[in-house]
């Protein structure tokens, strides 16, 4: 049995919103993508690549995200997604593969700590839409690479022209002016 198309698309949007919000440093928005009773299970690299640390609820997710504050910039590239219905209506499972870059600057040297990882997810449909109810992050491999140059992150923590809010999975309308038209022209 497979997940309904509309549910699969909504859950996939949730996964990508998470990656985008983390990369844009919008950690309060990340928290809202989880249920109030969610469990986030994380590894403790390099000691353990398996999920051994547990964070519970919104406060736990917020604490986990605070650890990224010391990282200059991140980029989460979702490279694989598998979704399946759970054992009840409004419950779904996901296995997400990702390459996560963590760029840091120390002593004028830029380093990219790359995690090749997998998220094993549980999703719940809530009145606010689909949310992450459980996430276990497993690291499959870690690389460290020198980097020549790194674009500075935006100071306001927002993606340029992204038009998305993690709290709402709907794109926000952009105020644009088509070429050759004045704002008064319909």
Task: Please identify what each model-predicted range represents.
Residues 2, 48-49, 107:
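Short coil/turn segments at secondary-structure junctions
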Residues 5, 51-55, 110:
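Charge-dense, low-complexity intrinsically disordered segments
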Residues 8-9, 40, 62, 102:
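Generic signal for short, ordered secondary-structure residues
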Residues 29, 33-97:
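A solvent-exposed, acidic/Ser-Thr-rich amphipathic alpha-helical stretch
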Residues 70-186:
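A beta-strand edge to alpha-helix "cap/lid" segment located at domain peripheries
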């Amino acid at each position: 049995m497979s997940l309904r198309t509309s549910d699969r698309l909504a859950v996939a949007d949730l996964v990508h919103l998470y990656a985008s919000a983390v990369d844009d440093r919008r950690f309060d928005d990340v928290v809202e993508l989880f249920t109030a009773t969610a469990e986030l299970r994380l590894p403790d690299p390099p000691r353990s690549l398996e999920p051994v640390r547990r964070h519970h609820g919104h406060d736990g997710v917020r604490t986990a995200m605070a650890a990224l504050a010391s990282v200059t910039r991140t980029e989460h590239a979702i490279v694989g997604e598998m979704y399946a219905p759970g054992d009840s209506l409004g419950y779904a499972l996901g296995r997400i593969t990702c390459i996560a870059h963590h760029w840091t600057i120390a002593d004028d040297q830029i380093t990219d700590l790359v995690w090749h990882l997998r998220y094993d997810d549980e999703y719940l449909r809530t009145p606010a839409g689909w949310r992450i109810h459980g996430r276990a992050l497993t690291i499959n491999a870690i690389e460290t690479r020198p980097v020549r140059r790194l674009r500075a992150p935006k100071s306001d923590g927002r993606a340029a022209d992204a038009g998305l809010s993690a709290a709402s999975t709907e794109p926000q309308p952009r105020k644009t002016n088509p070429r050759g038209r004045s704002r008064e022209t319909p």
